[in-house]
Design a protein with these regions (language model features):
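Histidine-centered phosphotransfer motif of kinases
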Residues: 94-101
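Membrane-anchoring alpha-helices and their flanking helix-loop junctions
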Residues: 1-89, 101-169
Length: 169
């Protein structure tokens, strides 16, 4: 049962973040060409997409093997087995939410490709929803890991590794 739950967590996450959100952005952007003539836009968008996907995949793989769990936890509801160890190294030494940081970079690449206000609006809406999700997740991490999480939270930014941009609650 745990293996099925874990598989479903990865499947749902992949479909949602890599497929559904970009498809919604494309659909509501008036369905522009997927291969616009602006070469620079294609290159910049592709670089952002690649960096974002690589960051997210690194974080997911790291969580699976180091944290012994799965990232799919939605608004306090366990969709797949939760991690049993707090991860503070690897990609998690740079950001408390490197999967989302990668997803934000990936979706910004999609926005560059589409270059429409609709895709940007959907991107901003997605960020707002994820901020609510992250706050819910942080409460759970505080409950599960206590002082260890508190120390980690005070030293690592929510999304960005730069102390200047670190969000302190």
């Amino acid at each position: 049962m745990k293996a099925i739950k874990e598989f479903l967590g990865y499947l749902i996450g992949g479909i949602l973040f890599v497929g559904l959100i970009p498809s919604i952005m494309w659909f509501f952007s008036g369905k522009p060409s997927l291969f616009p003539s602006n070469t620079l836009r294609i290159i910049v968008g592709a670089i952002l997409v690649a960096i974002g996907l690589a960051t997210s995949v690194w974080s997911i793989v790291y969580m699976r093997y180091k944290g012994n769990g799965n990232p799919m936890d939605a608004f306090g509801h366990e969709i797949a087995p939760r991690t049993v160890h707090l991860m503070t190294d690897g990609p998690y030494r740079l950001s408390r939410n490197p999967m989302l940081t990668g997803t934000f970079i990936y979706l910004s690449g999609i926005c560059v490709w589409l270059l429409t206000w609709q895709s940007f609006l959907i991107f901003v809406l997605f960020i707002a929803i994820m901020l609510v999700q992250v706050r819910t997740e942080e409460k759970r991490l505080q409950r599960d890991f206590g002082e260890e999480y508190e120390i980690y939270r005070n030293h690592v930014g929510r999304f960005l590794p730069l102390t200047l941009f670190k969000h302190k609650d």
